[in-house]
Every structure is written in C-alpha cells, then in structure tokens.
C-alpha cells in the first residue's frame, strides 16, 4: 500500500470530518490511516468505536502511537537534535521502542534517513535481541531464534563454536509454526 508506517504521509493535509466518516465506515487496507487522521482532527475514541465497531482497547493502542508521533515531531521542532542532548536521546529511544522506523523519523524531522541512522548509532540506540521460546518453557530449545527490539536487555548467548546464518525471504514469520 506504499506506506512507511501509520503516519505514512506526514505532510499531507488532513481531510474533513465528513470525508473521514466515509473512510472509517468500511473496513479496508487503508482504514487504519483514516483512524489516525480522525484522531488528529479530533474524533473521540467513543466516536471512532461507534463508527468503526473496533474494540476500544485497540483504538487506545492506536491513540498512543498517534500521540507519540506528535510528541516526537514537536520535540524535534523545539530542541537540538544532537547526540549530546540527553532529552533528544530519550525521545529517540522512546520512538524506537514505539516502533517508529528511521525512515519515519526522517520524514517527521525533515532530515535524511542516513542522518537518523547515524544519530541512532552514535547515541547507542541500537536493537537488542530476545529469544523466541519455541518450546513453551517445557524444555531447552536447541535451535533458538530471536527477534529484534529496542527494549532494554539482550538475550543473545554467544558461544565459541561454528555458526550458520540462514537468510531468507517470504511469508515466514514468528508464530507461523515453521521451525528451522
């Protein structure tokens, strides 16, 4: 669908409430973006629930992301975006914990994506890795795999033995039930 995230087109003008009503009523691949826009123009969570019939819990989760987007953008407009600014480092980390990509941050902060990546690396804002418990804690997994996150901590256990890296593409994802 050509989106880089929930706020896929940060510079676009927001539609009117009337335009959004039509976009919100019918489930489709673009409705999530209309929900974001509706939140930005002032629809309440109750209104969105009535129109979309989406559970309020999910709407609150989306609202948290939309609110964080605003905080990230506003911070960049009012503050120095340099690695020696501890507040900027905290906002950058929080943005990554919320799942904002370097490309999204570049769009919001009107900077090249490479500058965001360099800033992130310079401030130590890098992903960590957590183990996917494929055996439901019943026994030790001998072929563990990991997912990346920006949460604190790291569960990777390095060993002094030969290693194999499997690169692949396609529809395989965590939770699909395909074990390697």
Model-based region annotation:
Residues 1-180:
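ATP-dependent carboxylate/acyl-activation modules
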């Amino acid at each position: 669908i050509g989106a880089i995230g929930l706020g896929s087109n940060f510079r676009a003008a927001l539609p009117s409430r009337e335009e959004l009503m039509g976009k919100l009523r019918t489930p489709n691949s673009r409705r999530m973006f209309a929900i974001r826009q509706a939140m930005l123009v002032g629809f309440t969570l109750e209104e969105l629930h009535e129109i979309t019939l989406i559970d309020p819990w999910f709407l609150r989760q989306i609202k948290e992301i939309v609110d964080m987007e605003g905080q990230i953008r506003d911070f960049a407009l009012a503050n120095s975006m340099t690695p020696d600014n501890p507040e900027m480092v905290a906002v950058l980390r929080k943005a990554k914990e919320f799942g904002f990509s370097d490309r999204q941050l570049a769009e919001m902060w009107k900077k090249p994506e490479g500058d965001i990546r360099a800033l992130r690396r310079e401030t130590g804002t890098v992903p960590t890795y957590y183990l996917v418990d494929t055996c439901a804690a019943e026994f030790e997994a001998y072929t563990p795999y990991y997912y990346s996150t920006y949460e604190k901590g790291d569960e990777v256990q390095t060993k002094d033995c030969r290693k194999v890296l499997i690169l692949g593409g396609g529809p395989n994802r965590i939770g699909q039930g395909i074990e390697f």
